[in-house]
Amino acid sequence: MLLAVPSKGRLQEPTLKLLEAVGIKPLASDERALVLPTSWPDVNLIKARPEDIPYLVESGRVWAGVTGHDYVLESGSNVVEALDLEFGRGRLVVAVPKSSGIKSVEELPPGARVATKFVNIAYNYFAELGKRVRVVKVTGSVEVLPQLGIADAILDVMATGTTLEVHGLTPIATVLETSARLVVHPEYTSHELTKKLVTFIKGYFAAQGKKMIFLNVPAARLEAVLSVLPAMEAPSVTKLAKGDIYEVFSVVSEDVLPDLVMKLKNAGAKDIVVTSIEKLIS
């Protein structure tokens, strides 16, 4: 099955890193190749522009893909946003030159030219406001167009605001919040491969900021140790074959580790081992 990934842009690198983290690794390195086999035998990657991915998934020829929420809305495609992947966050904003003195969308003059590649979103947004503007379709960078006198405002994604600042622009309205999403064709939402991918991605996210801690505890100190040891549900406790010693392990938040280790040690724990967790699947 084909899984579409961005061929360029700010979503490309984090998408590939996420897939590698869940075990989907390309088995070919030719940058010219558009379809790549992966370490999951039943999954091939297809590289595509992020704005095209919703259409590819809607067609049914591509089972799923990673693209931005903004591109999904712009396309109007019938796809399911199965997961928010928590990267590529930004705001789709209306921005104007600082020198214009305009502070809100309501202050835009009638017929103002708004440059954007999100044409459908722009039409819908301004129509809902009852604002008459002229939407100028642009496929490349839009930030320079007000300087050239080609547009009075732009509608584009803002991540940090630095690019707008460099071009003398300031945001005056937020149209929507966006981030990377795993999108799936409606007929494949209950497919075992989809469930597998969603489970592994959720497991990867759940493991972030978590550590596995192992420790040995004399029987006489077990109650004291368990009283200070946090756990997702309850710590696992196993009696060792020799001696009156118990092995205890638990999943804990990384940020509590420095204080926790000292508390456990003072309570009587020994042989404390802390390890990373790749995935946490519940």
Swiss-Prot record:
The reaction(s) this protein catalyses: 1-(5-phospho-beta-D-ribosyl)-ATP + diphosphate = 5-phospho-alpha-D-ribose 1-diphosphate + ATP
InterPro entries: ATP-PRT_HisG_long, ATP_PRibTrfase_cat, ATP_PRibTrfase_CS, ATP_PRibTrfase_HisG, HisG_C, N-reg_PII-like_a/b, N-reg_PII/ATP_PRibTrfase_C
One Pfam family cited in the UniProt record for this chain: HisG_C
Gene Ontology CC: one annotated term: cytoplasm
Subcellular location(s) of the protein: Cytoplasm
Pathway: Amino-acid biosynthesis; L-histidine biosynthesis; L-histidine from 5-phospho-alpha-D-ribose 1-diphosphate: step 1/9
Signal peptide positions on this chain: none
E.C. numbers: 2.4.2.17
Alphabetic keyword roster: Amino-acid biosynthesis, ATP-binding, Cytoplasm, Glycosyltransferase, Histidine biosynthesis, Magnesium, Metal-binding, Nucleotide-binding, Transferase
Transcription regulation found in the keyword field: no
Molecular functions (GO terms): ATP binding; ATP phosphoribosyltransferase activity; magnesium ion binding
Gene Ontology BP annotations: L-histidine biosynthetic process
Entries under PANTHER family matching the protein: ATP PHOSPHORIBOSYLTRANSFERASE (PTHR21403:SF10), ATP PHOSPHORIBOSYLTRANSFERASE ATP-PRTASE (PTHR21403)
NCBIfam families in alphabetical order: hisG, HisG_C-term
Descriptive protein name: ATP phosphoribosyltransferase
Lineage start: Archaea, Thermoproteota, Thermoprotei, Thermoproteales, Thermoproteaceae
Gene behind the chain: hisG
